[in-house]
Amino acid sequence: MSFTRKKGFYKQDVNKTAWELPKTYVSLTHIGSGAYGSVCSAIDKRSGEKVAIKKLSRPFQSEIFAKRAYRELLLLKHMQHENVIGLLDVFTPASSLRNFHDFYLVMPFMQTDLQKIMGMEFSEDKIQYLVYQMLKGLKYIHSAGVVHRDLKPGNLAVNEDCELKILDFGLARHTDVEMTGYVVTRWYRAPEVILSWMHYNQTVDIWSVGCIMAEMLTGKTLFKGKDYLDQLTQILKVTGVPGAEFVQKLNDKAAKSYIQSLPQSPKKDFSQLFPRASPQATDLLEKMLELDVDKRLTASQALAHPFFEPFRDPEEETEAQQPLEDSLEREKLIVDEWKQHIYKEIVNFSPIARKDSRRRSGMKLQ
């Protein structure tokens, strides 16, 4: 049998999966698995830094899997912002395209995510700092022409110094159900995405930030719908049933008829809904949890809100130097063609300097 693994690589079984990686990465520890792959922490011997390594699950099983793998690699390569996860390294044990079956993404290691710590009581200054970082990351992602579409607490990595990075952006497309057989949680999704009832824009992510911030204030999920219709019912209980001006904007006839059939109900008083929040916090929430996408705040507008005054540094609110160029986005390629494109990206990859915060908040999560 011919030897197909590159020199300098070693093999280790992790959680019943074979990992093959360069000898520069040691102390492999399994930290999680999902629909698209498994993640281990490791130490990079060159820097002594702890990193996260993701092995994609069967990236070339089908055209859909291969396209998603290509897009994930492209997105991670493009993102260079302290509040957005980026790529430190990418490698394959394959010595040529012919025996290329797997590849691994190396990213900064983060201790936990918001999902795991949602039960803790967040002080207002912690909420300010964490939400400010979410919005800085979104401003950058949006300026690259990317929309997250599936922002939720589990996609927000945090470390013990309250530093936050956005994960899994730009991947939540219609392929989710086809690939995994289940619908990703809808509790944080904007109504226009859940129901496809009107055009949507980058402010879909601002709605999600509103839901997450509300949960940090109360310790409870704001809109916990059992299904699509129940999700809408939960939302309208808070936002009120919209009037004729909003209904005119709906593209979907069924949604139009349904909304028109509902009895008018007023918007809830946010100061009563969030009694421990400051007036500035409730004002920001109202502007992020706005049903009408044309009236909802953008990331830039939200960053300028007085709620963030204690932490704001406009110089850190940077935009991408150029939009993400995904010339293959609309291409229908076969698996072998996707494989060629991915292999080329891996071979040509050169690491870039990390973008990390120049300042420290002095805050601790616990």
Curated annotation (Swiss-Prot):
<dbReference type="GO" id="GO:0005634">
    <property type="term" value="C:nucleus"/>
</dbReference>
<dbReference type="GO" id="GO:0005737">
    <property type="term" value="C:cytoplasm"/>
</dbReference>
<dbReference type="GO" id="GO:0035556">
    <property type="term" value="P:intracellular signal transduction"/>
</dbReference>
<dbReference type="InterPro" id="IPR017441">
    <property type="entry name" value="Protein_kinase_ATP_BS"/>
</dbReference>
<dbReference type="InterPro" id="IPR008352">
    <property type="entry name" value="MAPK_p38-like"/>
</dbReference>
<dbReference type="GO" id="GO:0106310">
    <property type="term" value="F:protein serine kinase activity"/>
</dbReference>
<feature type="active site" description="Proton acceptor">
    <location>
        <position position="150"/>
    </location>
</feature>
<keyword id="KW-0597">Phosphoprotein</keyword>
<feature type="modified residue" description="Phosphoserine">
    <location>
        <position position="47"/>
    </location>
</feature>
<feature type="binding site">
    <location>
        <position position="54"/>
    </location>
    <ligand>
        <name>ATP</name>
    </ligand>
</feature>
<feature type="modified residue" description="Phosphoserine">
    <location>
        <position position="350"/>
    </location>
</feature>
<keyword id="KW-0067">ATP-binding</keyword>
<keyword id="KW-0418">Kinase</keyword>
<comment type="function">
    <text>Serine/threonine kinase which acts as an essential component of the MAP kinase signal transduction pathway. MAPK13 is one of the four p38 MAPKs which play an important role in the cascades of cellular responses evoked by extracellular stimuli such as pro-inflammatory cytokines or physical stress leading to direct activation of transcription factors such as ELK1 and ATF2. Accordingly, p38 MAPKs phosphorylate a broad range of proteins and it has been estimated that they may have approximately 200 to 300 substrates each. MAPK13 is one of the less studied p38 MAPK isoforms.</text>
</comment>
<dbReference type="InterPro" id="IPR038785">
    <property type="entry name" value="MAPK13"/>
</dbReference>
<keyword id="KW-0805">Transcription regulation</keyword>
<comment type="similarity">
    <text>Belongs to the protein kinase superfamily. CMGC Ser/Thr protein kinase family. MAP kinase subfamily.</text>
</comment>
<feature type="binding site">
    <location>
        <begin position="31"/>
        <end position="39"/>
    </location>
    <ligand>
        <name>ATP</name>
    </ligand>
</feature>
<dbReference type="InterPro" id="IPR050117">
    <property type="entry name" value="MAP_kinase"/>
</dbReference>
<feature type="short sequence motif" description="TXY">
    <location>
        <begin position="180"/>
        <end position="182"/>
    </location>
</feature>
<keyword id="KW-0131">Cell cycle</keyword>
<feature type="modified residue" description="Phosphotyrosine; by MAP2K3, MAP2K4, MAP2K6 and MAP2K7">
    <location>
        <position position="182"/>
    </location>
</feature>
<protein>
    <recommendedName>
        <fullName>Mitogen-activated protein kinase 13</fullName>
        <ecNumber>2.7.11.24</ecNumber>
    </recommendedName>
</protein>
<feature type="domain" description="Protein kinase">
    <location>
        <begin position="25"/>
        <end position="308"/>
    </location>
</feature>
<keyword id="KW-0808">Transferase</keyword>
<dbReference type="InterPro" id="IPR003527">
    <property type="entry name" value="MAP_kinase_CS"/>
</dbReference>
<dbReference type="Pfam" id="PF00069">
    <property type="entry name" value="Pkinase"/>
</dbReference>
<dbReference type="InterPro" id="IPR011009">
    <property type="entry name" value="Kinase-like_dom_sf"/>
</dbReference>
<dbReference type="InterPro" id="IPR000719">
    <property type="entry name" value="Prot_kinase_dom"/>
</dbReference>
<feature type="modified residue" description="Phosphothreonine; by MAP2K3, MAP2K4, MAP2K6 and MAP2K7">
    <location>
        <position position="180"/>
    </location>
</feature>
<dbReference type="GO" id="GO:0005524">
    <property type="term" value="F:ATP binding"/>
</dbReference>
<dbReference type="GO" id="GO:0004707">
    <property type="term" value="F:MAP kinase activity"/>
</dbReference>
<dbReference type="GO" id="GO:0004674">
    <property type="term" value="F:protein serine/threonine kinase activity"/>
</dbReference>
<keyword id="KW-0723">Serine/threonine-protein kinase</keyword>
<comment type="subunit">
    <text>Interacts with MAPK8IP2.</text>
</comment>
<keyword id="KW-0346">Stress response</keyword>
<keyword id="KW-0804">Transcription</keyword>
<keyword id="KW-0547">Nucleotide-binding</keyword>
